[in-house]
């Protein structure tokens, strides 16, 4: 499917048939036209899931744009970057904490359509998306398919990243169905 914004790789609406919930990678190079498009489509609540260091070093222009409400609510759980492919699901499960409750509540109770994002729109954004879709009553299959769309959208970027950073194991950073399935098994009833 690709990104609905030209300056991002992984911005897309959740499969709800509208723009109520839009997940994204870092929207750091938005054009004036894209900002207008977001505003015209009522996507005016912005939730930044990045940790403090990312937030400070790579600001998002939407924080200062008139007509937008900006919330910096970093995903706090999950710990360090996983050291093995098997540890990715555990990292995801660690994200489900009180801060995650606040994030989900802010997104689901927003008065406008919401765009939420992290760096790549993959891990933190993927867990948030899975929880939102689960709360909305979507099947595990729909949730997994949404998560796996990130793999399609980011594959070229991830391969290039590993080429530039050979110490990174591509099997850790590529989205895998079993990782989000573990999250869904941990939150069967919300």
Predicted features, each with a name:
Residues 1-115, 127-190:
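Cys-dependent protein tyrosine phosphatase-like superfamily
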């Amino acid at each position: 499917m690709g990104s609905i914004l030209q300056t991002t790789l992984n911005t897309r609406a959740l499969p709800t048939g509208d723009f109520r919930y839009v997940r994204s990678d870092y929207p750091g190079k938005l054009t004036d036209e894209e900002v207008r498009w977001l505003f015209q489509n009522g996507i005016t609540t912005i939730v930044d899931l990045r940790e403090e260091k990312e937030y400070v070093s790579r600001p998002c222009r939407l924080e200062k744009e008139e007509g937008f409400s900006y919330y910096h609510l970093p995903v706090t759980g999950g710990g360090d970057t996983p050291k093995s492919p098997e540890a990715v699901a555990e990292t995801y499960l660690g994200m489900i904490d009180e801060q995650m409750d606040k994030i989900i509540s802010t997104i689901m109770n927003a008065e406008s359509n919401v765009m939420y994002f992290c760096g790549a729109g993959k891990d933190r954004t993927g867990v948030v998306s899975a929880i939102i879709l689960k709360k909305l009553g979507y099947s595990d299959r729909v949730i997994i398919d949404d998560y796996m769309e990130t793999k399609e959208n980011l594959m070229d970027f991830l391969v290039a990243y590993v080429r530039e950073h050979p110490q990174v194991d591509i099997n850790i950073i590529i989205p895998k169905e079993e990782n989000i399935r573990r999250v869904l098994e941990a939150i069967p009833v919300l």
